[in-house]
Amino acid sequence: MSKLLLEKRLREKDPDSDERLIARANTLRAFRKLDNKRKRYVLDFLNEAELIAYDTKSDDQPIVLLSGANLEGLDLSGADLTGLDLRAVSLTQVNLKDALLVDANLDHAVLRNADLKGANLSGAFLNFADLSYADLRSTKLHKAELFTAKLVGADLRKTDLSEADLASADLSGATLDHWDQLKSAASLENTVLPNNIIRD
């Protein structure tokens, strides 16, 4: 990766260039082969080098696209993942307790059984994400986009859902403190509520 960055000027290459494709292939290969501790080192490097940032204004692809990466079971508790592009990344059973994911893009990500207690996902994109049975207690989802997200069996006690877009989301079997949590959501259109009532 260092050679691609320094000698091949990876940052200046087009998204469909050979250099970008090689960087992505090498990264996905590393995530398949390495243990979780080393996967965390790779992710930290990519983050610090600003190779996986998501630009909410331009919607440009990051320099290294992580879609399809396997980060299952990783310990990312307390990590600063603000604004990262984690679209379609497998994050099943990941520990994201108290992590910062403000404005991160997690569209189509798989977060089944993930620990997100106390995490800040304000403004995050979670459209079509699978958060089934995730622990979202005391999580901030203020202004988060959760269109068609799966929250089946998720623990949403003390979760901040203010101005969150929950249109067409599935909250079947989810646990809430009270119904007032949902009153401040931006949209509940066609949302499947915890008692399986569809809000239209």
Model region roles, listed by residue range:
Residues 1-67, 72, 180-200:
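N-terminal capping/linker segments that flank leucine-rich repeat
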Residues 56-200:
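Tandem repeat scaffolds
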